[in-house]
């Protein structure tokens, strides 16, 4: 459980529970919601509470014109409601005038608002689990442009949402848009290391054998944390851009420049929040391989692979990449899950901890800072831990 002193029986005792718990899966988030529900049901049963599921069935059916509505199929009056949404699930489709449309983040966000409306203010409290923050990559204004994430957070607050739980936000400072709303930005560092060591138990984190490298300046904070807890050194790349041109909505990258010590003969770990097309990650890996890196392991909380898997297959085949880690917090294609080089990190239990803690009005501080669990994991694998 979240702390070593709390047992499932104490955690799910009725006198500590804020209100009866209900989970609602937005279309496209059913798998993750079911996994979260499985953990919660198991803990409740350990506490002597007989329950089959906490999930309240819901859907967002569409009319032939493309309009949709939110529908919750059982009462949630007085419940502590948690809605789970995956804005990155592009595999979901709907028909529009005879054409098949893939769901965009905008569609998923609209469905979330529909289901909040369907609850219609009857719930005791409404929380949103949005692992991939809607509009999170548009977190600041540089020109005459929208601030989608900030406006979305303000909309959710106005609709009565009390808590937002997100993972590895592109820039967590977006919470400044809603300073009076509970906002938890969760980093799955422990889950990533646990999966990595399970699949690569021979890893040696000594600074002579292992180095953490940030792919750009924006990812420095998460890579600094990895290097600090592992006790190894840190390097980084910075991107030189051509600010005179805009290609596909951004200034094109001219080159990746490396700042750091030699990587020759070392295992390199690169962490970022998103693998979109993956071009930057592959360019960084290629440059490190040219400098003599022995193995290169990439990690991204949200493995989108918007340009497909072929280039990553080629990078693994020619020895540039060793492995890629990604979480189950967003949709992953069946083709990706079948790749030998891809390691899937299960964060459903971690998410369930947050649901249970918030439902019982308990502190989540121990969940947000898992350093004790990380140190115990590294000690178990005889790796030098450093706080």
Question: Where are the model-predicted features located?
Answer:
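PRPP-associated nucleotide enzymes
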Residues: 1-387
